[in-house]
Amino acid sequence: MQMMTRKVLLNMELEEDDDEDGDIVLENFDQTIVCPTFGSLENQQDFRTPEFEEFNGKPDSLFFTDGQRRIDFILVYEDESKKENNKKGTNEKQKRKRQAYESNLICHGLQLEATRSVSDDKLVFVKVHAPWEVLCTYAEIMHIKLPLKPNDLKTRSPFGNLNWFTKVLRVNESVIKPEQEFFTAPFEKSRMNDFYILDRDSFFNPATRSRIVYFILSRVKYQVMNNVNKFGINRLVSSGIYKAAFPLHDCRFNYESEDISCPSERYLLYREWAHPRSIYKKQPLDLIRKYYGEKIGIYFAWLGYYTQMLLLAAVVGVACFLYGYLDQDNCTWSKEVCDPDIGGQILMCPQCDRLCPFWRLNITCESSKKLCIFDSFGTLIFAVFMGVWVTLFLEFWKRRQAELEYEWDTVELQQEEQARPEYEAQCNHVVINEITQEEERIPFTTCGKCIRVTLCASAVFFWILLIIASVIGIIVYRLSVFIVFSTTLPKNPNGTDPIQKYLTPQMATSITASIISFIIIMILNTIYEKVAIMITNFELPRTQTDYENSLTMKMFLFQFVNYYSSCFYIAFFKGKFVGYPGDPVYLLGKYRSEECDPGGCLLELTTQLTIIMGGKAIWNNIQEVLLPWVMNLIGRYKRVSGSEKITPRWEQDYHLQPMGKLGLFYEYLEMIIQFGFVTLFVASFPLAPLLALVNNILEIRVDAWKLTTQFRRMVPEKAQDIGAWQPIMQGIAILAVVTNAMIIAFTSDMIPRLVYYWSFSIPPYGDHTYYTMDGYINNTLSVFNITDFKNTDKENPYIGLGNYTLCRYRDFRNPPGHPQEYKHNIYYWHVIAAKLAFIIVMEHIIYSVKFFISYAIPDVSKITKSKIKREKYLTQKLLHESHLKDLTKNMGIIAERIGGTVDNSVRPKLE
């Protein structure tokens, strides 16, 4: 054995490298000892292994066999001596590493006890307990804030009891009692007497105990190879030495614990939060935070607040929808489309070459009626409202978040975030720190960093191009399938087909393309999730926060393009660059550009949003409910059955599903994408907030059900806010103003109708003596001479036209015979000017209101600021008085000693 005298680096190699020979590291409080791995285990006398104890038959016990020491963490491994395969002595090597790790845990002060599984003799459960001294030591290291004295400030609303009509929505306080609140301060062992310690067993709650133990487990070494340390429970689990590591749930979710001292918080959460009968109740956020930690608590607080705000948006959206629905009868332009004497007499030009027939305008009657619902004045009002709503939501959430920071004691979260082991493992370059002028190690030079950033950016850009390619593929599909559906129209324009009344070629194409687009989106999401993690790992961020933020931006950028690209195409590109029947625009030189319905592409955008948003919500909820439930069901069938066997708490939890390394990352991502649908394209679909509201009400309870019933308990983590998702939402809110203004201007037909009503229905352009919408359809569909088709030299595929020599198409162009035939007419330029003016005015109005609201509403309320300042003052005063009391006491003792010394020295002289 030899003493390690120099600092060694971390190593995060591939999992299979853990099977290589290296030196086992054993630690005690005075030194680190390195033991060669060769030789028999009998010769290794330095291992301090946990004692094996038999299960005491108490299924709800959270303690060691002695019933005194609480279980703070569970480690699970498969007994190496009972494994069937032992390739190249792998089992022996893994056993040495595990024993060295457990020995080092004991050297760090943790207490271990091992118990074999009651259902599978191969499995061994190692129970970990942190004694008082260890908890105090690491609480000081981790800057954990602990109670000083009960808080005399009221943090809850003083009007809460007056809201008797909302009592049914509140948490039952007789079941979930309000938590006692305290003034807190970072723990210091030297000031232990200042803290509110009534009972050592309850001073550190189970969540804090688990967090401290996990901090130790993540940093204890077990092997050194080539002067490189290997350590941490995460690496041991990933390499298969341990099968799992997790804190315990405190009881079964559907029954209270038999132990009367157990608070059964998991059962309370299931009953008052996750159970379907509690779907209408507010969330017990304080208990969620206490049981799962602040990071989980802040997610559910944010999701709940977002859902509450959606209620207002949903009500206004439904009102606008009903306005459009009830106003259908006053929709003049739709009546003209459906009128046999107007729409029935208008012959529309073919929308593709040769194969597509001429068609009557009135076959779009039903779609025009549906379009009246969404393309109404109420839509404009709703778009403006949503621009203000999203600002109110973000500003009030900041205030709510500040309140939670105060209530949950995370205002001054003191967490010195350590570098990720994966980062330190690559620190091979030595540089001089410009500030400290000391040597420090970094993973790569400036040139190497530039290369990595370039490669990562190129990879992300490549995948974005792949999405764009898939969108182009969908466009080609739409063009091809539209031709197929158009050929089903009767060649004789006077013919009829019952299905055409409800399903036009454009609508059929839109529905099928939306479904295919949704499937492609789901497939690309599945692939890119793995690719994004690989890219971020290669990028090598320094801290876990940096890692999550980098991954967040990559995933959101990809998801943004993936989910919204098809919507942007329909809203802003489809039907905008089509030319006219005599000179159409071709995509890729082959496919004729898509055209919109005579009423515009707004209804198609609504269809796209409904299918993608609704399909995504249904798919995610099915996946979140069914997948963990099925996996747990399969696991139960695989286990040895036997109703006579009593299963301990740790074994019950082991058979639950593990939570992913990224925790609630994908839950946040799902909600942010939904937030984008609700805000970016809401002008085309006022029912989007209602769908989001219904989905979120279910989402909260589904996530709660998963956490409490299907997943192991997560290690509690601290968090002040929702992290990088806040600026992402702010960016979406700014972009939403532009997209909704452009949807109303360029996708809907609201501006052309207003221009016709105010300018072209009366002289000098119109024939009416008063403002009216009569004649809108006839005056806004351009005329084309059938003889001007470019393929007139070929056999004419159209029959049954009778005396028709003209057809109509959607555009604002001069008629044949005009000096500037088929050029844009004066109406077109009036409409363009009106659209641009509308966008500028709407954006400036909404942005002005947004900035005023942001300025007028402070991020932290005055009451919360006062509470924070008063708590700081009282905490400092309390610590100062305590310190002064100790100082006075010590000075008194010193004075007495000095006085005694003086008396002894003076007394002989007096004699």
Swiss-Prot record:
Changing residue 612 to A: Increased speed of phospholipid scrambling. Constitutive scramblase activity at basal cytosolic calcium levels. It comes from Mus musculus. Disulfide bonds join 331-372, 338-365, 349-807, 352-356, 596-601. Residues 323-376, 478-510, 574-602, 745-837 are extracellular. The keyword rRNA-binding does not apply. The chain crosses the membrane at residues 302-322, 377-397, 457-477, 511-531, 553-573, 603-622, 665-685, 686-706, 724-744, 838-858. Glycans are attached at residues 330, 362, 494, 778, 785, 803. This is Anoctamin-6. Changing residue 563 to W: Loss of lipid scramblase activity. It comes from the Eukaryota. It catalyses: a 1,2-diacyl-sn-glycero-3-phospho-L-serine(in) = a 1,2-diacyl-sn-glycero-3-phospho-L-serine(out); a beta-D-galactosyl-(1<->1')-N-acylsphing-4-enine(out) = a beta-D-galactosyl-(1<->1')-N-acylsphing-4-enine(in); a 1,2-diacyl-sn-glycero-3-phosphocholine(in) = a 1,2-diacyl-sn-glycero-3-phosphocholine(out). Changing residue 518 to L: Decreased lipid scramblase activity. Changing residue 518 to E/K/Q: Constitutive phospholipid scramblase activity at basal cytosolic calcium levels. Keywords: Calcium, Cell membrane, Chloride, Chloride channel, Disulfide bond, Glycoprotein, Ion channel, Ion transport, Lipid transport, Membrane, Metal-binding, Transmembrane, Transmembrane helix, Transport, Voltage-gated channel.
